[in-house]
Structures are given as C-alpha cells and as structure tokens.
C-alpha cells in the first residue's frame, strides 16, 4: 500500500513532473495576492475616499490589467506564470519538438487568457450573485418583472455551477495524485500544456535571453527604436512588479493571519474601550431641511421607516430600500453629502422588532 502511494511525495531524478504539493503551493500564492491587495486598497479608500475611491471601485479591472502585464512578461520570458516560476516550474507544450523551450504562439495566448480572464470572470460572477441575494432578501426588485425571473434562475443555478466547477478541479487533482495524470488542473489541459521542473539548461537559456534583450543594435530604424523603448519600459514595469511581489510573498501569510477571524477576536478583546458619550445634537433644521421632525420618519420617502438602515459614513437612518437605491445611484449620503458606498449600509435591529 505504501509503495503504491510513494509517488505522491517523492519523484525520481529523471522525472521532471512536479509533486502535488508544489502545484498546490504555486496556485495558493496568486490566490493570496488578490485579497491582500484588495484589503490594502479598501483601507486607503476608507481613509481618503476622494483620492482612492476610484481605485476601490475599479479594483478588479486594475488588478486584472496588472496581472495581465505580469503574466505576459513571465510567459514570454520563462514559459511560466509568476507563481509557477517562483516555485521553479515551467509550462511545456504537449508533444513539443526536441530543443523547443518557449511556448508555441497558440499555447502562449491560451495560457495568458486562462490565467487572467477566468479569475476575473469568477470574481465578477460571485459579486453579481451576492448582490442579487441581497436584493432578494430585502425585496428590492419587482417580483413581477422579467429581470426578477432571470435573477431567480441565476441564484438557483449558481450553487450547482459552483459545485460542478469545484468537482471538475478535484477530479483532475485526484487523477494527478493517484493515477499519474499529466495535468492537475483542467485549465492546463485547455491551454494544451503541462507543468515540469526547470532544468539548468532552462536557467542558462533564460539568462542568455535576458542578455540579448538588454543589448540593442545601434543600426535600427525609428519605428524599431520606439518599439524597443516601449518594450523595455513594459519589461521594467513588469520586472519591478514581479520583484515587489516576490518580496511580499512571505508577508502575505502574515496578512492572512492578521486579518483572520481568530486574531480579529483577540484584537477586539484587547482593544475594548468604554463607549463614548453621545454627541450633542443641535437644531438639525438650521443646516439640513431634508430631515423630518419625527425621528421615526425616513428622510427620503417621508414615511415611517421600514427595515431601519444606518449609513456608516454619517450615522443617519433611512429605510433600507430608500438608502439602497439612493446610495447606488449617487454614491453619497442624502443628508450630509459624504461619499458613501453600498458596503456602508448597516442594518439595524430594534428591541421592539
């Protein structure tokens, strides 16, 4: 029994097939980079919404563009993604010719699209589903509308779609472990490549290629010279980004621990301070005619509030439906005018129900 499972943790010197621990480690590296950068941008946006609000709203698109530049650089230089190259792995075209080190053009573009596009679409789909669930919980959409039926179909099919996606990846990983499969991920199979370890010949070829790109011929045309400058600038940007990511790899583990649930509870217990006294309220009518005289009335619809919801940026309370639509449309508090996003809506539960 032990002999049959020995190949899971050990490899022969002649076998360049990486172990399951190597491929899982390189996948978790890029998976940890996005949440860490996302949290940094969130802190910056909350501290200065006017300056970093755009960066927060377009984080997914900017991160995808940055990742595209990074992966393009490593695929063209090392025939591997950033995380694969970090763990000493490379992508090999299935059935490649002897002596061919770089990826073929077809496999290169398929690898780049699958590395960049699939995570972006998955993040967008998860955000869409979470938004639809929130709108359905508070009955924001019209129940008789055509869009409502489409939303219900998406919400009903998403769990099965996610289950099938995860089962698809699990099947490939089990086949890679137990039956010596060539691919641990179906995305590699779709790209027409497989992972292998870097050899000394690969490292020497990468160094030689880097030297050739640094030496530019003196006799070139103007268009070639401009193209070379742009290529060098793009390479410098991607190299600086990759170097920064390499230095921050081990810092990501610290961030993962720092913002974990267990550590958050510990910090909360250490930082328990007495509740400050309530602020002194002046005559609200002198500076905000939008506020009603009765505290139980919503400032937007002028009716008794339903599903009390406060805005974390200003503290004013509205109906959930009124606050949701207003903040989604104007991105600010209707009373104070402070910049506000949907994540600043805080649902209140009163003792009287």
From Swiss-Prot:
Membrane-topology descriptor: Multi-pass membrane protein
Gene Ontology BP, a term: protein import into peroxisome matrix
Subcellular compartments: Peroxisome membrane
Gene Ontology cellular-component annotations: peroxisomal importomer complex; peroxisomal membrane
Residues annotated as binding Zn(2+): 298, 301, 319, 322
Biological or metabolic pathway of the protein: Protein modification; protein ubiquitination
GO MF term list: ubiquitin-protein transferase activity; zinc ion binding
Segments forming RING-type zinc fingers: 298-337
Peroxisomal matrix topological intervals: 1-19, 77-104, 179-243
SUPFAM superfamilies, per database record: RING/U-box
Principal location listed in the UniProt entry: membrane
Segments traversing the membrane: 20-47, 52-76, 105-134, 140-178, 244-271
Free-text note on domains in this protein's UniProt record: The three subunits of the retrotranslocation channel (PEX2, PEX10 and PEX12) coassemble in the membrane into a channel with an open 10 Angstrom pore. The RING-type zinc-fingers that catalyze PEX5 receptor ubiquitination are positioned above the pore on the cytosolic side of the complex. The RING-type zinc-finger is degenerated and only coordinates one zinc ions, preventing E3 ubiquitin-protein ligase activity.
PANTHER family cross-referenced by the UniProt entry: PEROXISOME ASSEMBLY PROTEIN 12 (PTHR12888:SF0), PEROXISOME ASSEMBLY PROTEIN 12 PEROXIN-12 (PTHR12888)
Similarity remark: Belongs to the pex2/pex10/pex12 family.
Protein purpose: Component of a retrotranslocation channel required for peroxisome organization by mediating export of the PEX5 receptor from peroxisomes to the cytosol, thereby promoting PEX5 recycling. The retrotranslocation channel is composed of PEX2, PEX10 and PEX12; each subunit contributing transmembrane segments that coassemble into an open channel that specifically allows the passage of PEX5 through the peroxisomal membrane. PEX12 also regulates PEX5 recycling by activating the E3 ubiquitin-protein ligase activity of PEX10.
Protein name stated in the entry: Peroxisome assembly protein 12-B
Species of origin: Xenopus laevis (African clawed frog)
């Amino acid at each position: 029994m032990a002999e049959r499972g020995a190949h899971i943790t050990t490899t022969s010197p002649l076998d360049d097939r990486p172990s399951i621990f190597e491929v899982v480690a390189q996948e978790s590296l890029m998976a940890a980079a996005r949440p860490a950068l996302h949290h940094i941008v969130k802190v910056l946006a909350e501290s200065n919404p006017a300056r970093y609000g755009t960066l927060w709203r377009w984080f997914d698109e900017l991160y995808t563009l940055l990742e595209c530049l990074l992966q393009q650089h490593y695929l063209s230089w090392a025939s591997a993604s950033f995380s694969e190259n970090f763990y000493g792995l490379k992508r090999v075209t299935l059935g490649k010719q002897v002596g061919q080190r770089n990826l073929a053009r077809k496999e290169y573009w398929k690898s780049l699209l699958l590395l960049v596009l699939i995570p972006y679409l998955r993040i967008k789909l998860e955000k869409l589903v979470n938004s639809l669930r929130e709108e359905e919980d508070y009955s924001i959409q019209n129940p008789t509308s055509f869009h409502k039926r489409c939303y219900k179909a998406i919400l009903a099919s998403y769990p099965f779609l996610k289950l099938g996606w995860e089962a698809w990846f699990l099947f490939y990983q089990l086949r890679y472990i137990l039956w010596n499969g060539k691919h641990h991920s179906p995305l590699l199979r779709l790209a027409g490549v497989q992972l292998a370890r870097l050899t000394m010949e690969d490292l020497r070829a990468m160094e030689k290629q880097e030297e050739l790109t640094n030496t530019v011929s003196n006799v070139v045309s103007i268009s070639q010279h401009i193209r070379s400058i742009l290529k060098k600038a793009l390479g410098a940007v991607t190299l600086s980004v990759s170097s920064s990511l390499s230095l921050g790899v081990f810092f990501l583990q610290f961030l993962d621990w720092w913002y974990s649930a267990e550590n958050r509870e510990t910090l909360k217990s250490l930082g328990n301070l007495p509740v400050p006294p309530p602020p002194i309220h002046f005559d609200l009518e002198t500076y905000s005619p939008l506020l009603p005289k009765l505290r139980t009335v919503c400032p937007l619809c002028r009716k008794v509030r339903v599903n009390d919801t406060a805005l974390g940026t200003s503290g004013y309370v509205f109906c959930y439906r009124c606050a949701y639509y207003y903040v989604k449309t104007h991105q600010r508090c209707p009373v104070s005018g402070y910049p506000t996003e949907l994540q600043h809506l805080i649902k209140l539960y009163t003792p009287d129900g």
